[in-house]
Amino acid sequence: MFKKLIKRNKTKISHNDDLDLHNLPEHVAIIMDGNGRWAKKRKMPRIKGHYEGMQTIKTVTREASDLGIKYLTLYAFSTENWSRPENEVNYIMNLPVNFLKTFLPELIEKNVQIETIGFLDAVPKSTIEAIEHAKEKTKNNTGLKLIFAINYGGRAEIVQSMKSIYDELQRNGQDSKDIDESMINKHLMTHSYPDPELLIRTSGEQRISNFLIWQSSYSEFIFNEKLWPDFDGEEFKNCLKIYQSRQRRFGGLSKE
């Protein structure tokens, strides 16, 4: 079964008009993987790969916005990424500043709203200021919600939600019998977003790396072979077409 899944993820659909604009996922999440390997293949510093990856974010954001997708969540920096070399971490942490400096006017024009999930208290002040400025400038926009997961980890998110639930139970005189899925959802960082129907990971790696582990329970996974800087609008649309070829069962039986 797993071999069939991998084979299907490599499927290519060549014609753009095969994309059904009335059957798009509402929420797409992407693990943007392969920046370092892209740079290494070209004998360039790893930070060059991250720079080119930033350009891909612009491309995919434009595509998602133009197609009318409502939510795009991008795994920008995980809670585990702090173990990387200091100069690389510093460069990645400064990328949102550069990204928003160059791209914010277009995001505003495209009616895109910037939001974040993650533990931002550990993020540098200059990065936080750039993000908060972008949030303020786009807070009334009603198009695509572009959600950056920064210093985010799925396990840490669940631990935080459990602590928050415990506090709520204590305040309200409740006990563990009152805990259900809706209560957990309410205390997650993503509580105001629908679960992603589609989760894409680039670079050919086939794992979710602690990303949206609660929310992706019924997501369709596509493991794309392209390194993130090489992922473009056509690859994004091809992933959407593969998604449309799937039948989502949510644990039930096929309708066929």
UniProtKB/Swiss-Prot annotation:
Cellular component GO terms held in the UniProt record: cytosol
UniProt xrefs under InterPro entries: UPP_synth-like, UPP_synth-like_CS, UPP_synth-like_sf
Active site: 33, 81 (proton acceptor)
Domain of life: Bacteria
Pfam families xrefs: Prenyltransf
Subunit details: Homodimer.
Function summary: Catalyzes the condensation of isopentenyl diphosphate (IPP) with allylic pyrophosphates generating different type of terpenoids.
Protein known as: Isoprenyl transferase
